[in-house]
């Protein structure tokens, strides 16, 4: 899962949206640095990552990547799941339009920015103003996201080419998303993530 899915599942679970978004920017034990609700959100994010990576649908999808891009498949798929969530938001969350949800999520996250790591602050400078969560529905934007990640981290250069794997298996990936994401939504609503 990437930013949008983590925020969405956190909302359904009544967990800290801030903690769920912040988690990738925090190493080790967060308990000394953040309030309990944010810590709980960080831990939820980490559980979701482990759960998602071990889902049979996701393990199967990783195998569709070519040998030269398979190493970055987990990252590429996380971004792709956000694409499908953004694209199908009105079906999955009909009572909370995506643009309204993005505004709500931004308000929640802004409360912790003053005490956040610089890289997280930098992310927030772009995430909201450039409407990333809404733009995830556009595959051209997904390609830009993957290229941007590859540019910032040269060891992940294979992300550029992983775009072709997404394109080649788009329909099958969308089917897998529909197989597992509604289950995760139900788990979040039951606070079972």
From Swiss-Prot:
Keyword Transmembrane helix: yes or no? Answer: no
One Pfam short name: ACP_PD
Disulfide-bonded cysteines: none
Its keywords, alphabetically, are: Fatty acid biosynthesis, Fatty acid metabolism, Hydrolase, Lipid biosynthesis, Lipid metabolism
Q: What molecular function terms (GO) are annotated for this protein?
A: [acyl-carrier-protein] phosphodiesterase activity
Q: Which EC numbers does the record give?
A: 3.1.4.14
Q: Which domain of life is it from?
A: Bacteria
InterPro entries attached to this UniProt entry: ACP_PD, ACP_phosphodiesterase_gpbac
Task: Name the enzyme group at the top EC level.
Answer: hydrolase
Single GO biological process annotation from the record: fatty acid biosynthetic process
What this protein catalyses is:
holo-[ACP] + H2O = apo-[ACP] + (R)-4'-phosphopantetheine + H(+)
Q: Does the keyword Nucleotide-binding feature in the UniProt annotation?
A: no
Give the family per the record: Belongs to the AcpH family.
Record function comment: Converts holo-ACP to apo-ACP by hydrolytic cleavage of the phosphopantetheine prosthetic group from ACP.
Q: Would you tell me the protein name for this molecule?
A: Acyl carrier protein phosphodiesterase
Species name: Escherichia coli (strain K12)
Q: What is the lineage of its organism?
A: Bacteria, Pseudomonadati, Pseudomonadota, Gammaproteobacteria, Enterobacterales
Gene name in the database record: acpH
């Amino acid at each position: 899962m990437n930013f949008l899915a983590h925020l969405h599942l956190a909302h359904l679970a009544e967990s800290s949206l801030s903690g769920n978004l912040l988690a990738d920017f925090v190493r080790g034990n967060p308990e000394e640095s953040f309030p309990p609700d944010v810590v709980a959100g960080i831990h939820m994010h980490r559980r979701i990552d482990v759960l998602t990576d071990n889902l049979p649908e996701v393990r199967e999808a990783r195998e569709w990547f070519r040998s030269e891009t398979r190493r970055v498949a987990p990252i590429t798929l996380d971004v792709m799941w956000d694409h499908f969530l953004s694209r199908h938001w009105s079906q999955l969350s009909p009572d909370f339009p995506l643009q309204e949800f993005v505004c709500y999520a931004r308000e929640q996250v802004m409360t912790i920015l003053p005490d956040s790591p610089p890289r997280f602050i930098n992310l927030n400078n772009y995430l909201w103003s450039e409407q990333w969560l809404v733009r995830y529905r556009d595959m051209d934007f997904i390609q830009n996201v993957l290229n941007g990640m590859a540019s910032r981290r040269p060891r992940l250069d294979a992300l550029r080419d992983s775009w072709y794997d997404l394109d080649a298996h788009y329909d099958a990936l969308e089917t897998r998303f529909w197989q597992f994401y509604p289950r995760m939504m139900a788990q979040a609503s039951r606070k079972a993530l």
